[in-house]
């Protein structure tokens, strides 16, 4: 039987992970956070001291890169780098910022493409990211594109960071959101855009509902 896929795309802080996680739980599907996968690569780049703007340096790290994804009894996706649980480490603000640079490299996207598609071949999934409906799973049965005002997305990101015990200022977070939006929209490979057959949802006011 063919597996069912639901693709959820959108910029940082639009509410992708919240919607994807709840949808997967209700349907009994697997939730795949592709952003966590790219952050894991970014963490490897940072730990190796490689220059993220130097494709050759980053590509040299991909050969033999050991990334694994698993799920605990609570259903939370956990990421492993060379056998080490890096689920919390990849959520640091510095790693998130680096992930956007790393994700713009064609070699990285090609390297991770089959890894992501394999999850959807093996089980029913709800997958979120920037290019799920356009590149990773272009034939997904349901496609949703979430968006929200940058200021609202920055507020959500700030709250998330503080809940993790990380100090941050609103202006710095907003600046990072806007910078990442620009990087995601203008990158040469798999830029952030709404799939033609995706349903558009603006979540700006949902926090206040």
Segments the model singles out, each with a brief description of its role:
Residues 35, 83, 112, 126, ...:
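Residue-level signal for inorganic ion chemistry
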Residues 16:
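Conserved lysine of the Walker
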Residues 87-164:
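ATP-dependent NMP and nucleoside kinases share a basic, alpha-helical "lid"
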Residues 25-92:
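N-terminal phosphate/diphosphate-binding loop that engages ATP/GTP or pyrophosphate donors
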Residues 71, 116-123, 132-135, 139, ...:
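Small-molecule kinase domains that catalyze NTP-dependent phosphoryl transfer to phosphate-bearing small molecules
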Residues 6-8:
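Hydrophobic anchor at the beta1->P-loop junction of P-loop NTPases
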Residues 13:
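Walker A (P-loop) phosphate-binding loop of P-loop NTPases
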Residues 19:
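Hydrophobic positions on the alpha1 helix immediately C-terminal to the Walker A/P-loop
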